């Protein structure tokens, strides 16, 4: 079996693709993959590290306002389609899967026009422009939020969930918090603002230090590498809480999640998939800087089921953050109920569901 995959720009499009690749490899050890991305995108570095064959095309995203750049983008799209067709003709895949980001546009479009079975996987509650465009041409659209269904041709939509959920659930032996000098007997909160960190979350954490010092729970706080030095200087000046460990980045984060009781994070699709699969209660602070404010819609899908406390960035403060944490961590019943509600929204077999869609197409 041969499968071509495309998706990139952010980890939210790349990691679900890699999780799906692992699922197929588990079932078919001799499967061959080709990943098509951009030369300068995050996907090249991540995918090649996994020893997956990688080819690149040149493509940029559309601007939302009319501009000459969009004319250039159309030209790049057409060139990308031509190049994708040559890659696909050489590789001869049984199916092509796009996981979002503008790079998958020319690749999946080319595959559809060549008559190759195609799937797009939409991770968010509000779909991106590329997947909406591709939905007219592909065989199936796999979604992770019921809210996304109305944006696609209904006869093509299949609810699969995010394969990243299957990956975190499959981790049998997690890493120990003792690596960071944290107690394995205390309730633990993980705070992080995405791969690059988030300045507003960092500000709130710094501001809540005096109150945090008096709490019996502990915090593992990830600043993001670009913010680390500035945050450490401020914590040194203010006096950091003894029950908090601060790191710039957490490699292999999924391996630590089973030791975490509550998460404070943005509301990206990967985060939602992971915490719902594991049943981890959360305080979600959606990024307002994403397309169509889709993170807030993601967050509300948990908030409306009382599976998360949602704080908008405009209302975030140290006081509000510690209040939200206290509501969950200091009440065993609340913690237990939120964990159960969160887990009820998870799709731990998402990778297997997406694989089933692929198998159906190949018949």
Swiss-Prot record:
Any single Gene Ontology cellular-component annotation: plasma membrane
Record-linked HAMAP family: MurG
UniProt-listed CDD domains: GT28_MurG
GO biological process, one term: cell division
Stored SUPFAM superfamilies: UDP-Glycosyltransferase/glycogen phosphorylase
Annotated protein name in UniProt: UDP-N-acetylglucosamine--N-acetylmuramyl-(pentapeptide) pyrophosphoryl-undecaprenol N-acetylglucosamine transferase
Domain of life, per lineage: Bacteria
Gene symbol of the encoding locus: murG
Role noted for this protein: Cell wall formation. Catalyzes the transfer of a GlcNAc subunit on undecaprenyl-pyrophosphoryl-MurNAc-pentapeptide (lipid intermediate I) to form undecaprenyl-pyrophosphoryl-MurNAc-(pentapeptide)GlcNAc (lipid intermediate II).
Enzyme class: transferase
Family of this protein: Belongs to the glycosyltransferase 28 family. MurG subfamily.
Cellular compartments annotated: Cell membrane
Organism encoding this protein: Bacillus subtilis (strain 168)
EC number(s) per entry: 2.4.1.227
Entry's Gene Ontology molecular function annotations: glycosyltransferase activity; UDP-N-acetyl-D-glucosamine:N-acetylmuramoyl-L-alanyl-D-glutamyl-meso-2,6-diaminopimelyl-D-alanyl-D-alanine-diphosphoundecaprenol 4-beta-N-acetylglucosaminlytransferase activity; undecaprenyldiphospho-muramoylpentapeptide beta-N-acetylglucosaminyltransferase activity
NCBIfam families for this protein: murG
Pathway involvement of the protein, from the record: Cell wall biogenesis; peptidoglycan biosynthesis
RNA-binding keyword on record: no
Its membrane topology: Peripheral membrane protein
Residues involved in UDP-N-acetyl-alpha-D-glucosamine binding: 10-12, 124, 195, 295
């Amino acid at each position: 079996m041969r499968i071509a995959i495309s998706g990139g720009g952010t980890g939210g499009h790349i990691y679900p693709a890699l999780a799906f690749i692992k699922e197929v490899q588990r079932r078919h050890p001799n499967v061959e993959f080709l990943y098509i991305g951009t030369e300068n995108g995050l996907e090249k570095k991540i995918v090649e590290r996994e020893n997956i064959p990688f080819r690149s095309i040149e493509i940029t995203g559309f601007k939302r306002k009319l501009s000459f750049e969009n004319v250039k983008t159309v030209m790049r799209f057409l060139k990308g389609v031509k190049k994708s067709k040559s890659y696909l003709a050489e590789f001869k895949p049984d199916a092509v899967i796009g996981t979002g980001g503008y790079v998958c546009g020319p690749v999946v479009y080319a595959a559809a026009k060549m008559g190759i079975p195609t799937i797009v996987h939409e991770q968010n509650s509000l779909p991106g422009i590329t997947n909406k465009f591709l939905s007219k041409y592909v065989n199936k659209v796999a979604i992770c939020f019921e809210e996304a269904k109305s944006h696609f041709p209904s006869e093509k939509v299949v609810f699969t969930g995010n394969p990243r959920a299957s990956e975190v659930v499959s981790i049998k032996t997690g890493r120990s918090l003792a690596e960071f000098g944290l107690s394995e007997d205390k309730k633990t909160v993980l705070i992080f603002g995405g791969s690059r960190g988030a300045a507003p979350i960092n500000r709130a954490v710094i501001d809540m230090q005096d109150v945090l010092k008096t709490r019996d729970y502990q915090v593992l706080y990830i600043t993001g590498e670009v913010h680390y030095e500035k945050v450490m200087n401020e914590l040194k000046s203010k006096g950091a809480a003894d029950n908090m460990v601060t790191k710039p980045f957490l490699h292999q984060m999924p391996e630590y999640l089973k030791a975490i009781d509550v998460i404070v994070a943005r509301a990206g699709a990967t985060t939602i998939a992971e915490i719902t699969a594991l049943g981890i209660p959360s305080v979600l602070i959606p990024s307002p800087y994403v397309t169509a404010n889709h993170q807030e819609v993601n967050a509300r899908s948990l908030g409306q089921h009382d599976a998360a406390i949602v704080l908008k960035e405009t209302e975030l403060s140290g006081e509000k953050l510690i209040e939200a944490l206290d509501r969950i961590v200091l009440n065993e019943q609340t913690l237990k109920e939120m964990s159960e509600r969160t887990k009820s929204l998870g799709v731990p077999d998402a990778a297997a569901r997406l694989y089933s869609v692929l198998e159906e197409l190949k018949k």
